[in-house]
């Protein structure tokens, strides 16, 4: 085999013949080869749940398949993209190219092939960060330098950094693009001092066109590494080279960060990414399902999106978990199956938190209204009145603001929510039939 990607693709073709189609689509199709070191093949799984399942159910089969292909007994190790980003990849040496010096190039596979601008789902929480990243990719060091992206875990910071790298390389194959974590920068710096190779280290990172450095907050408290990165930053900035930095917090909130570094991080543009709203979460799930060739009912994606609102990584992991559970018990995917599949990761110990989705579903069950009709523009009484009841209950049973409730009902104005609440409140004082129906809905929600 010419390289590990070819080897793994050949292995996948063989594995596809040995397992059921749902199992292959769920567990194996989305894996990629990471590296091959000392007879250990490292495979990247899309998330922690898939990694754990592959380790416990497919390691032996994969090892046997690779033995048939290579005649070598390879150990198998699984990782997830987050840990992949922090490890150095050893690839078979590429063929020499006289027109291009690869000595300062990061191997192409260090940039996750799935993290591009095309695969990034844009929503209200990341729209500005996406626009800034695209501007930087289109004109390195001419738009915002540095670009500082911050936000919580699993919200897409690393995705945008990889997307910048891919875009730059695609439009300028000779560009020297380096992506690494601040932890890897620290470790390499320490090793360079130990091995008396400080000059080589500086040349490596001060002679690039684009430096993408992830999780810069881990430089906090590391005085010598901060000193080195300060000079690296200056060298690149003075040569008009692009610097992109990510963190879990803005520069001013990183503890024990030198003021001179903090001020340099603030030279360019600082943008944040916030957790995705409901519509964005649904769009993310749809894109993930399409990319993986999965046919997922809309009600299931709506259920998952309502239950998992923390970050994209957990959201996609929940989808894979539902698909896997469906495959294992050989049943079609629906909302009830999704609830069963996710019961272990959705805590039940605390008091039940009722969501607007829960209310819409309960009202829909009682009044025979489809979930999508609550967001639609339909004004027929058979839809409009149940919608008003759902708005009333959303105001009574959730902590959501008026604009948020309106947003969940198709982007309606907050005054519409107020009107619905006042109308239903007034009717409930005299309409016994409505009282019974609302009581029935409340029983469903308990």
From Swiss-Prot:
Lineage: Bacteria, Bacillati, Bacillota, Bacilli, Bacillales
GO biological-process terms attached to the record: DNA replication initiation; regulation of DNA replication
Pfam families, alphabetized: Bac_DnaA, Bac_DnaA_C, DnaA_N
Chain segments carrying region Domain II: 93-109
Record-stated family: Belongs to the DnaA family.
Record comment regarding domains: Domain I is involved in oligomerization and binding regulators, domain II is flexibile and of varying length in different bacteria, domain III forms the AAA+ region, while domain IV binds dsDNA.
Entry function: Plays an essential role in the initiation and regulation of chromosomal replication. ATP-DnaA binds to the origin of replication (oriC) to initiate formation of the DNA replication initiation complex once per cell cycle. Binds the DnaA box (a 9 base pair repeat at the origin) and separates the double-stranded (ds)DNA. Forms a right-handed helical filament on oriC DNA; dsDNA binds to the exterior of the filament while single-stranded (ss)DNA is stabiized in the filament's interior.
Positions that bind ATP: 154, 156-158
UniProt GO molecular function: ATP binding; ATP hydrolysis activity; DNA replication origin binding; lipid binding
Highest taxon listed in the record's lineage: Bacteria
Domain III, AAA+ region: annotated segments: 110-326
HAMAP family, A to Z: DnaA_bact
Subcellular location(s) per record: Cytoplasm
Quaternary state and interactors: Oligomerizes as a right-handed, spiral filament on DNA at oriC.
Keywords: ATP-binding, Cytoplasm, DNA replication, DNA-binding, Lipid-binding, Nucleotide-binding
UniProt-annotated stretches for the region Domain IV, binds dsDNA: 327-446
Keyword Nucleotide-binding attributed: yes
Protein name listed in UniProt: Chromosomal replication initiator protein DnaA
Domain I, interacts with DnaA modulators: region residues: 1-92
Cellular component annotations (GO), alphabetically ordered: cytoplasm; plasma membrane
InterPro entries reported in the protein's UniProt record: AAA+_ATPase (IPR003593), Chromosome_initiator_DnaA (IPR001957), Chromosome_initiator_DnaA-like (IPR020591), Chromosome_initiator_DnaA_CS (IPR018312), DnaA_C (IPR013159), DnaA_dom (IPR013317), DnaA_N_dom (IPR024633), DnaA_N_sf (IPR038454)
SUPFAM superfamilies registered for this protein in UniProt: P-loop containing nucleoside triphosphate hydrolases (SSF52540), TrpR-like (SSF48295)
């Amino acid at each position: 085999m010419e390289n590990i990607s070819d080897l793994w693709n050949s292995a996948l073709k063989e594995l596809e013949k040995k397992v059921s189609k749902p199992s292959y689509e769920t567990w194996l199709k989305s894996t990629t080869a990471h590296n091959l070191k000392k007879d250990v093949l490292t495979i990247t799984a899309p998330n922690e749940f898939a990694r754990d399942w592959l380790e416990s159910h497919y390691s032996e089969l994969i090892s046997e398949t690779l033995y048939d292909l290579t005649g070598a007994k390879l150990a198998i190790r699984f990782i997830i993209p987050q840990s992949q980003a922090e490890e150095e990849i050893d690839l078979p040496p590429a063929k020499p190219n006289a027109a291009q010096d690869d000595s300062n190039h990061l191997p192409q596979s260090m940039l996750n092939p799935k993290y591009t601008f095309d695969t990034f789902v844009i929503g209200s929480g990341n729209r500005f960060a996406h626009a800034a990243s695209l501007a930087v990719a289109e004109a390195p060091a001419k738009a915002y330098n540095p670009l500082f992206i911050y936000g919580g875990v699993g919200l897409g910071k690393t995705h945008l950094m990889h997307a910048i790298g891919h875009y730059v390389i695609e439009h300028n194959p000779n560009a020297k693009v380096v992506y690494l974590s601040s932890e890897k920068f620290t470790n390499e710096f320490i090793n360079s001092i130990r091995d008396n190779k400080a000059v080589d280290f500086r040349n490596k990172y001060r002679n690039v066109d684009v430096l993408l450095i992830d999780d810069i907050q881990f430089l906090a408290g590391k005085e010598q590494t901060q000193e080195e990165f300060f000079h690296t930053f200056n060298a690149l900035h003075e040569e008009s080279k692009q610097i992109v930095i990510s963190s879990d917090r803005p520069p001013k909130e990183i503890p024990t960060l030198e003021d001179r570094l903090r001020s340099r991080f603030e030279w360019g543009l600082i943008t944040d990414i916030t957790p995705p709203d409901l519509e964005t979460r649904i769009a993310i799930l749809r894109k993930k399902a399409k990319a993986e060739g999965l046919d997922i009912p809309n009600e299931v994606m709506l259920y998952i999106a309502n239950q998992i609102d923390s970050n994209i990584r957990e959201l996609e992991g929940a989808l894979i978990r539902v698909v896997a559970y469906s495959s294992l018990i050989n049943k079609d995917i629906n909302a009830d199956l999704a609830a069963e599949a996710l019961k272990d990761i959705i805590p039940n110990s605390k008091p039940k938190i009722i969501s607007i989705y829960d209310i819409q579903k309960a009202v829909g069950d009682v009044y025979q209204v489809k979930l999508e009709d609550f967001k639609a523009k339909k004004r027929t009484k058979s839809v409009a009145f149940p919608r008003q009841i759902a708005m009333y209950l959303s105001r009574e049973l959730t902590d959501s603001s008026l604009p948020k409730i309106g947003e969940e009902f198709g982007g309606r104005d907050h005054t519409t929510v107020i009107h619905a609440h006042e109308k239903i409140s007034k009717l409930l004082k005299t309409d016994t039939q409505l009282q019974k129906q609302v009581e029935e809905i409340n029983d469903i929600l308990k």
